[in-house]
Each structure stands twice: as C-alpha cells, then as structure tokens.
Amino acid sequence: MKESVISSFDYLKSMTSFDPKTPQYMVNFLKKSEHYCIGVIDIVNSSEISSLLTTKELEKYYGSFLNIMAKIVDQNRGFVIKNIGDCLLFYFPNFAETQTNDKFINCLNCGLKMTEIHSEINQYFKEIELPPINYRISADYGEVSIMKTNFSPNIDLFGTPVNRCVKINHLAKQNSMIIGRDMYRIVKKNADFAYEKIGNYAVNTRFAYPVYSVRKYSNII
C-alpha cells in the first residue's frame, strides 16, 4: 500500500514538471512576480445581443470591437493578454510606486480613450447594419504571477489584481471607467483626472474594497 502511494506521488510530481517539448499542454510560472496595472473591458448585455445576430454577424461585431480596443491598448503602450469571450484583458508592465507614474497615466488614458470612442464605434456599426454596443472598463494595480505555456509564446497573468479587476467591472456605468483602491492611491494626486468614489466591492463579510470612477478633469469644467 505504501509503495502504491509513493508511486502515485512520484507519478503526479512528474506530471507537474514543465517540459516545453511535450505535445501535451503544460504551464510554467516564472520565478519572479511583477507589479502590473491590469485593465478589463467588457461588453454590456452581450448574451442578448448574441441571440439576435447570425454567426457571421457575431464574428464581425465582436471582431471589430476587440480589434479596435486592442489597437487603443497598443497606442497607449499596453499589451493585450487575451480575450475571454467578449471581454478583453490587458496590462501595463513595470509598475512600481517608487518609479514615475507615466505608465499609470497611460493606463488611465487608454481606458478613457475607450470611453471617448463609443459614439464613433456605434456610428460605424450603424453603417454596417450592426446593433449599437455598450461596455464597461475597469483597472487596478498590484502584484501578479506570470505564466507561460508550451503552446504559446504569450504570457498570462494570475493574481488578486486580475481577479479584482474582473469582479469590480460591473460597478462601472455603461461606457465609463472605474479603478480600484490600490490604483487610486497612486494616481489620486494627478490633477489631470477627477475621481469619485462610487461604491465598494464586497470581498467578504469583513472587507469592502473601494472603487472610483475616473474622468478627464478638462471634461468637467
């Protein structure tokens, strides 16, 4: 019995060893974690919209939206991690509170540009006979683990900032941007942006995580 348990343990341990040449899907976490800013943009009522469109129309609808948003991320020096259905996950690397906050500003500018282009996207969709689109943007900052697979050169990110960013997204109003407390603490003194606390995300029964809306200050004066 003991030999059987040891054998099973060794077998399971061998299955966890990363082999980049194996034909099986495997993951490997880099030894060093990083502090990144994470962003998410998610379409509102996508299930209802999907039910009204053909497969070809859906491909054009989501493909156009995701490509436009990915381009905005790139223009602001961010990187797309992946899309999860109609949701786009992206990040801005090499953040640290001891460094200048230029890349935090890039993240804010990226999200706000996404909100500003809303009417233009809907005008384009109208011209190609697709329904209007609405979406929400959320961002936060913190320590993440970096994962790679043997099937792709691209990275994936895991950690509390990623989870929180996805969880708080629904608190944003349509076609607006929100940020979590950890990012707010770093950018709140920047005079180019205006912030307003809009509520809390209940992490558990004891802890509520504050969430803030973001706007360009020039747009409210």
Question: What is the role of each PLM region?
Answer:
Residues 1-25, 174-221:
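Intrinsically disordered, glycine/charged-rich C-terminal tails and inter-domain linkers
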Residues 66, 70, 112-122, 169:
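Structural signal for well-ordered, non-membrane alpha-helices
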Residues 61-65, 110, 114, 161-164:
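Hydrophobic alpha-helical membrane-association signature
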Residues 140, 160-185:
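Catalytic/regulatory signature loops of cyclic-dinucleotide turnover enzymes
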Residues 77-103, 121-160:
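Catalytic core of nucleotidyl cyclases, primarily class III adenylyl/guanylyl cyclases
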Residues 25-106:
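Catalytic NTP-binding/metal-coordinating core of nucleotidyl cyclase/transferase enzymes
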